């Protein structure tokens, strides 16, 4: 016994056209064969819903169905279509957004897959701040899909050729359904290829590519920053269909440095100084990230956590000949373990500076 068309769409008798369209749309999206390839139950549900929609969306056929049920269309097929394909047209006009994606989208995906380059790959490498300053060359080992040496991506044994798929006649697409409603789907036999590999290559088992390890020289330019990527063209996986390789993206991870902290092109470092150096000022020598010894001037009367700017002693600016700055942050060291002479000196200094017993917090 055939199912009631209203029941198939989850509707009650007397449903409006809008309700019929909404109900069918919901089922079509969920059970369309291209979204459920190989699922016979989904294909059956989709077919039933489509038949129900064809009848209920057409006023004449709906009236006949409401009066006579399924018997109205037995024997003579879908009579009533002779007056025009209004119900059928409605399907494509009202649900063009669904069916366009099924009918043309998959074709486009197959076409794009055959013409697209291979898959891109990612690789992370950790380097020191010094490596980032000077630049760095290193060999890295990657695993990727490369063109099969035996079949050169053709997927068949040497001396043999693929045969045309007899299910889709080489188109990669098959038409399902009958009557006035047909659905085009990816061929389940050749999976959209349009051909069958009768004698697959023994080396790659018909894939057209092999997994291989390769050693690649990586050149990291001076000034590279943390989390930046280097693109290595053609060092990704191969697409055997067109023999084009994807790219390799190497992500740079820079280790923390025990002295220097980086902020873009600039470097920051703490500068430990004594009370006397802070009070009187002094010229001192320091070493930069480049291990270069330079003289800097500590101005007299400098306070704790004040900054001293050293121009062009920061990081190289990528792909230029310019440099960032080095910013030194003073850290005045409090002397400990004083001997008797040092204690007397500080006591006398305190008297000279009139250090009192009271401190005004408002002057802090």
From Swiss-Prot:
Homodimer. Induction: By heat shock. Zn(2+) 1 binds at residues 148, 151, 201, 204. InterPro entries: DnaJ (IPR012724), DnaJ_C (IPR002939), DnaJ_domain (IPR001623), DnaJ_domain_CS (IPR018253), HSP40/DnaJ_pept-bd (IPR008971), HSP_DnaJ_Cys-rich_dom (IPR001305), HSP_DnaJ_Cys-rich_dom_sf (IPR036410), J_dom_sf (IPR036869). One of its GO terms (cellular component) is cytoplasm. A zinc finger (CR-type) spans 135-213. The keyword Cytoplasm applies. This is Chaperone protein DnaJ. CXXCXGXG motif repeats lie at residues 148-155, 165-172, 187-194, 201-208. Participates actively in the response to hyperosmotic and heat shock by preventing the aggregation of stress-denatured proteins and by disaggregating proteins, also in an autonomous, DnaK-independent fashion. Unfolded proteins bind initially to DnaJ; upon interaction with the DnaJ-bound protein, DnaK hydrolyzes its bound ATP, resulting in the formation of a stable complex. GrpE releases ADP from DnaK; ATP binding to DnaK triggers the release of the substrate protein, thus completing the reaction cycle. Its cofactor is Zn(2+). One of its GO terms (biological process) is chaperone cofactor-dependent protein refolding. Keywords: Chaperone, Cytoplasm, DNA replication, Metal-binding, Repeat, Stress response, Zinc, Zinc-finger. Binds 2 Zn(2+) ions per monomer. It holds the Pfam family DnaJ_CXXCXGXG. Residues 4-69 form the J domain. The J domain is necessary and sufficient to stimulate DnaK ATPase activity. Zinc center 1 plays an important role in the autonomous, DnaK-independent chaperone activity of DnaJ. Zinc center 2 is essential for interaction with DnaK and for DnaJ activity. GO terms for molecular function: ATP binding; heat shock protein binding; unfolded protein binding; zinc ion binding. CDD domains: DnaJ, DnaJ_C, DnaJ_zf. Zn(2+) 2 binds at residues 165, 168, 187, 190. It is found in: Cytoplasm. The gene is dnaJ. Its main location: cytoplasm.
């Amino acid at each position: 016994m055939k199912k009631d068309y209203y029941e198939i769409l989850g509707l009650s008798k007397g449903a409006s056209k809008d309700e019929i369209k909404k109900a069918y749309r919901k089922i079509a999206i969920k059970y369309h064969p291209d979204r459920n390839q190989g699922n016979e139950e989904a294909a059956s549900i989709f077919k039933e819903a489509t038949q129900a929609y064809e009848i209920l969306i057409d006023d004449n056929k709906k009236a006949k169905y409401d009066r006579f049920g399924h018997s109205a269309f037995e024997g003579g097929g879908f009579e009533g279509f002779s007056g025009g394909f209004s119900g059928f047209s409605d399907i494509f006009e009202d649900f063009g957004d669904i069916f366009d994606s099924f009918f043309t989208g998959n074709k486009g995906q197959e076409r794009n897959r055959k013409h697209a380059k291979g898959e891109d790959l990612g690789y992370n490498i950790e380097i020191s701040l010094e490596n980032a300053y000077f630049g760095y060359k290193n060999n890295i080992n990657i695993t990727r899909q490369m063109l099969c040496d035996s079949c050169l991506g053709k997927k068949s044994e040497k001396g043999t050729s693929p045969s045309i798929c007899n299910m889709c006649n080489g188109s990669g697409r098959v038409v399902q359904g009958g009557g006035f409603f047909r659905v085009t789907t990816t061929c389940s036999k050749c999976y959209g290829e349009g051909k069958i590999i009768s004698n697959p290559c023994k080396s790659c088992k018909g894939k057209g590519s092999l997994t291989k390890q390769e050693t690649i020289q990586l050149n990291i330019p001076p000034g590279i920053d943390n989390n930046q990527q280097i693109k290595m063209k053609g060092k990704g996986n191969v697409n055997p269909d067109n023999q084009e390789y994807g790219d390799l993206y190497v992500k740079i991870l820079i280790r923390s440095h025990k002295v220097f902290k980086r902020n873009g092109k600039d470097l920051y470092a703490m500068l430990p100084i004594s009370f006397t150096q802070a009070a009187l000022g002094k010229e001192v020598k320091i070493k930069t990230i480049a291990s270069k010894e330079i003289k800097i001037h500590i101005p007299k009367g400098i306070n704790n956590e004040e900054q001293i700017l050293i121009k062009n002693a920061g990081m190289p600016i990528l792909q230029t000949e310019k440099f960032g700055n080095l910013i030194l942050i003073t850290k005045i060291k409090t002397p400990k373990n004083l001997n008797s002479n040092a204690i007397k000196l500080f006591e006398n200094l305190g008297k000279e500076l009139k250090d009192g017993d009271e401190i005004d917090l408002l002057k802090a």
